[in-house]
A protein has these predicted regions:
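N-terminal strand-loop-strand
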Residues: 12-54
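Unchanged
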Residues: 59-150
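C-terminal alpha-helix
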Residues: 154-159
Length: 161
């Protein structure tokens, strides 16, 4: 029997799809090292060696995405950065503890301003196993996650103009 076109006041539980939404922001921090652009990458705690990612985290209530990205960059890498522009959004669905989660991560391009990569504040050191400047032109192959590789490629394209 087809679904009726009128409003359905009751939908059986077996037809309900519960999807939680998460909104995060992250940064592609770029600087010149030995005449070549490089980006700040992290290896998140608990991930195997060679699992490089971009710094990112959940947007706090009332916080703007760009502010979150700057905060996460500082917390996870130890460096300060200056905003350039928004690069784009990465959208994906994952399952956490049996619950489907729809996630949107807004990424921003930043220029390195100050600080030493790896000088992570003590309260955040448990989140990051390692930090490294990756050559920007190699980052689209070195980053572990597809959406982050796309953001690195966008940053490279933007800085090549």
């Amino acid at each position: 029997m087809p679904w009726p076109t009128a409003a359905r006041p009751h939908v059986p539980l077996c037809y309900k799809v519960v999807v939680r939404r998460e909104f995060s922001a992250g940064g592609v921090v770029v600087r010149n090292l030995r005449g070549r652009p490089a980006l700040a990458a992290i290896r998140p705690a608990g991930k195997p060696e060679g699992t490089w990612a971009l710094p990112k985290g959940l947007i706090a209530p009332g916080e703007r995405a760009e502010v979150t990205a700057l905060r996460e960059v500082r917390e996870e890498t130890g460096v300060e950065a200056t905003p350039v522009e928004k690069l784009g959004d990465v959208r994906y669905v994952y399952t956490w503890d049996g619950e489907r989660v729809f996630k949107v991560v807004s990424f921003f391009l930043f220029r390195y301003r100050a600080g030493r990569l790896g000088d992570i504040p003590p309260e955040h050191v448990h989140e990051v196993a390692e930090t490294r400047w990756l050559p920007l032109e190699e980052a689209p192959e070195l980053l572990a996650y597809k959406g982050e590789r796309e953001m690195a490629a966008k940053a490279l394209e933007r800085l090549s103009r």
